[in-house]
Amino acid sequence: MAKVEVGLDRVFLGGAHSSIQGKRIGLLTNHTAVDRNGVTAIDRFLARKDCKLVALFAPEHGLYGQQHASEKIKDSKKGEVPIHSLYGANRRPTDAQLKGIDVVVIDIQDIGVRSYTYASSLFYMMEEAVKRNIEVVVLDRPNPINGLTVDGPMLHPKWRSFIGYINVPYIHGMTLGELAEFFNTEYKVSAKLTVIPMKGWKRGMDFKETGMQWIPTSPNIPESDTPLFYATTGLLGELRLCNIGVGYTLPFKLIGAPWMNAEQLSRYLNSQGLGGVRFTPLYFKPFSGSMAQLDCQGVLIQVVDKKTYKPFAVQGVLIGAIKSLYPQKFKEVMSHIGKSEKDLFCKAVGSEEPLQFLKEDKLVGWQIAEFQRAERELFMEKRKNYLRPEYAEDYRPNL
């Protein structure tokens, strides 16, 4: 098994720390930022004598990851170091919070999906740092989905928000460090940016191949493969069409409802010729959240080949299947979705066009799956400029 060294390892255990020596540090991080010995970035910085940790910045879910999605978080302290919440009264650091900081270091485990907000906190921080001539250092970590899968629509400027801040596909196949460099150049941010890359990570790696231990990034992302399923059913959750395993033991890994027929749905989905996935009938009872304590039927989504699996394409077929097999329930649920829910869906998906597809009478699955293919292909060409060469499968260092 590979032993990947993340950016944090290389800064403190590998000697690549000239960018922080003698500096006053602001650290955007949370509980996921640990080195190969399980020591957190916070503790590493607190223990250093050649730099000073003067402020902590916490993203959505809080510094310790215990807050649920959309819960506001107050400022607090860790010892004498202030913890500034970037998911409370404000989502951007203020003048007062950045005062006295020479370098902002960002170390956080992202999940590789545009609508997950950790990347947006990084982008906001970069924009605020450059206004104040503060350097930015990103300590890179793996994309847990992998660095090859690119799927889903781009982001239309109309729907730019905290759950989708830059124009990349819904599943972008980039690390947080690569996204930072993309944002810095393509959006002309021009921050003084340093990315400390990983050593030993390759784009095709499954997270379990890295030798790292997965730390849940938030309450409903408990396992290293959950991000792949978040990319598969998360938008279904925004539409509230059915239960997606949140409130049960398998968040994002299933779809189901009291009005579904498990055998019928699994047969239909398995007949669609989708690559890398199979659907198994499932009977379950959510213990909280959507459809709590109701007997539900649906399917367990089982990815059998991650290299051919396209999560957003599968999501389109799932929506199409529900509309095709249960048209009256589909119509009923969609009729009760208000403007705020529709807007949230459009912000997450990056466009209002998929919502228009859902209103059509015909089967919509493949329309959504193929949506914006040409735009995605153009992005793939641009993306090549920001992929770190050492992460390539065939990379050989110049010696």
Predicted regions and their residues:
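Conserved functional hotspot residues or short segments at active or partner-binding sites
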Residues: 256-371
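N-terminal phosphate-binding or glycine-rich loops at protein starts, especially the Walker A/P-loop
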Residues: 4-51
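Short internal beta-strands
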Residues: 52-60, 139
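Glycine-rich, aromatic-lined ligand/substrate-binding cores of catalytic
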Residues: 201-289
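Glycine-rich oxoanion-binding loops at beta->alpha junctions
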Residues: 70-101, 113
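Glycine-rich, charge-decorated loop segments at or immediately adjacent to ligand/cofactor-binding or catalytic sites
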Residues: 65-69, 137-159
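Conserved anion/nucleotide-ligand pocket segment
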Residues: 160-232
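Glycine/threonine-rich flexible loop motifs
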Residues: 110-122
